Amino acid sequence: MCRRFALGLDWDAVASQFAVDEDDVRVDTLPQPSYNIAPTQNIGVVAQGKDGRRHLTGAYWSLVPRWSASKVLSYPTYNARVESAHVKPAFTESTKSMRAIIPASGYYEWKGRRPFYFHAPHDELLS
């Protein structure tokens, strides 16, 4: 994933898009929509709960390995590469069972110091 992304939709629209029941939306944990969401901030995610239902809730944007005693590590863990995540110690366990959908309106990639915003042609929700 990139280092910055945007979500300009309201959470009701996100819940509807991903078939999350109203009772399974934790509004109190969800951040305000933003066009500058950065690592270590609170983000919204859709994930399957232990009850087998989809839940929309807030989450810390990074990956904290189970063996870590702190959220703050000496190296960033928010940007796993799909081609190597299954073999890196920090990501291995999570790639097997901890999946989530991260809804976004778009994301930013930089060329030098200039950000470029990527989004769907008609601003449909990305995930």
Name each region found by the language model.
Residues 1-127:
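Short linear sequence motif anchored by a di-proline
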